[in-house]
UniProtKB/Swiss-Prot annotation:
The active site is at residues 48, 55. The keyword Oxidoreductase applies. GO terms for cellular component: cytoplasm. This is NADPH-dependent 7-cyano-7-deazaguanine reductase. It comes from Helicobacter pylori (strain Shi470). The keyword Metal-binding does not apply. Transmembrane segments: none annotated.
Amino acid sequence: MTPELKSLGAKTPYIFEYNSQLLEAFPNPNPNLDPLITLECKEFTSLCPITSQPDFGIIYIRYIPKDKMVESKSLKLYLFSYRNHGSFHESCINTILLDLVQLLEPKYLEVYGDFASRGGIAIKPFVNYAIKEYQEFKEKRLLNAK
C-alpha cells in the first residue's frame, strides 16, 4: 500500500523529546475533494519551560489536504514527543502548525489547544494557515475560533 511509512504496523518506540521527524504523510487518494479532516489528541502533555511542571491539554487539528495526508500513528508519536519538552502552550501550537504545514503543504490547516487551567487561567491558543485560494475560509475560521 504505502511501503515508505515507517511507524504503521511496526513495533512502537516511544520518544518523549520533541521530534518533528516522527511525522509521516501518505498520498491523498482524493485530491479533487476538499474534506475538512479533524484529528483530536485528548492526551497531549508538555512541560512548562519555567517550572518544569506538566501541562495537559486536548489538541484539535483540522485540515483540508492537498496532495498529502498525515499518517495518524506518526502524528500520535509526534505529539507524544512533546511529553518532556519545555514550551509554552502558544509555542507548542505554533510549532505543531508549522511542522504539519511543512510536511503536508495543505490547502488549509488549523491547530487549537484546549489546555487545563493552571493558576485559575485556561489557555486556549488557536492558529491557522491557508494557501491563497483559502484565505477567506481562514479568516472566517479565525473569527469563529473557540
